[in-house]
């Protein structure tokens, strides 16, 4: 992703750039499922929902580093984003806003703005790089599913947090280890 679409940063910002890599191999998992099943939007949406859970569960070290950066900024602005700024950035925004006690419906509304602000081409560009084998069959339905956000995707992450950790605050303090800071 970074090599394909590098950020256009000033030298000052390039010195301060930090890469925190997160991936759920979403498109690859869709392609593999399509080999065993039919091209199915409902299934692809389930893959997206699972990806949002994987962002939280498989990358706790990245989230810990992310929050250390936010905490250490001491009031200075921090810019965080992913290639399309909808899935991984959506999870990051959900975590930050939840810790700041932003109302859930406001978090949801902000998240859903991705559908209005991104073209589907921008939204899927990040996923194309996850394919390990160029002969995999990526369908238009996969790409259209990847190019949109649905509240069910974010809700899958929220439900995981509520069921497994009770709250974002508990995830932050106990799972990410900020209760000792």
What spans do the regions from the language model cover?
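Cys-dependent protein tyrosine phosphatase-like superfamily
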Residues: 1-79, 92-181
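Ser/Thr-glycine-rich phosphate-binding loops at phosphate-binding pockets of nucleotides
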Residues: 84, 88-89
């Amino acid at each position: 992703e970074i090599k394909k679409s590098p950020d256009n940063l000033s030298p000052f910002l390039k010195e301060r750039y930090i890469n925190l890599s997160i991936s759920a191999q979403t498109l690859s998992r869709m392609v593999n499922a399509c080999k065993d099943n039919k091209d199915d939007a409902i299934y692809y949406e389930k893959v997206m929902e699972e990806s949002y859970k994987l962002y939280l569960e498989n990358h706790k070290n990245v989230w810990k580093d992310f929050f250390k950066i936010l905490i250490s900024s001491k009031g200075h602005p921090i810019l965080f984003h992913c290639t399309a700024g909808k899935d991984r950035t959506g999870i990051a925004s959900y975590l930050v806003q939840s810790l700041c006690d932003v109302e859930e419906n406001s978090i949801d509304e902000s998240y859903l703005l991705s559908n209005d602000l991104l073209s589907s081409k921008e939204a899927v560009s990040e996923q194309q790089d996850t394919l390990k084998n160029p002969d995999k069959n990526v369908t238009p339905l996969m790409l259209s599913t990847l190019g949109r956000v649905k509240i069910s995707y974010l809700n899958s992450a929220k439900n995981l947090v509520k069921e497994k950790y009770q709250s974002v605050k508990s995830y932050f303090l106990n799972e990410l280890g900020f209760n000792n800071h």
